[in-house]
């Protein structure tokens, strides 16, 4: 028989709070979860992410290893 009283209390409607606002509910062992970032305000998921690559990785590699001027035959 399983022991009683050894498992934490389960909250099926735990509130996820970001910047003082309830953004979703999930199941958890805590009644409230406070987060700094969630999918609703993360730049990757909102599409506001801007990739700034002033020098391409391939160009940087070619310059670093001296392969910039010669082409393979």
UniProtKB/Swiss-Prot annotation:
GO cellular component: ribonucleoprotein complex; ribosome
A Pfam match: Ribosomal_L31
PROSITE patterns per UniProt: RIBOSOMAL_L31
GO biological process, one term: translation
Key words of the record: Ribonucleoprotein, Ribosomal protein, RNA-binding, rRNA-binding
Listed GO MF terms: rRNA binding; structural constituent of ribosome
Stored InterPro entries: Ribosomal_bL28/bL31-like_sf, Ribosomal_bL31, Ribosomal_bL31_A, Ribosomal_bL31_sf
Record-stated family: Belongs to the bacterial ribosomal protein bL31 family. Type A subfamily.
Summary of subunit composition and partner proteins: Part of the 50S ribosomal subunit.
Record's function text: Binds the 23S rRNA.
Protein name: Large ribosomal subunit protein bL31
Organism: Synechococcus sp. (strain JA-3-3Ab)
Source taxonomy: Bacteria, Bacillati, Cyanobacteriota, Cyanophyceae, Synechococcales
């Amino acid at each position: 028989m399983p022991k009683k009283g050894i498992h934490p209390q389960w909250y099926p409607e735990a509130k996820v709070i970001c910047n003082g606002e309830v953004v979703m509910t999930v199941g958890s062992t805590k009644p409230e979860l406070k987060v700094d970032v969630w999918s609703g305000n993360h730049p990757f998921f909102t599409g506001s992410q801007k990739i700034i690559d002033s020098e391409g990785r391939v160009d940087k590699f070619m310059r670093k290893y001296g392969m910039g001027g010669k082409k393979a035959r």
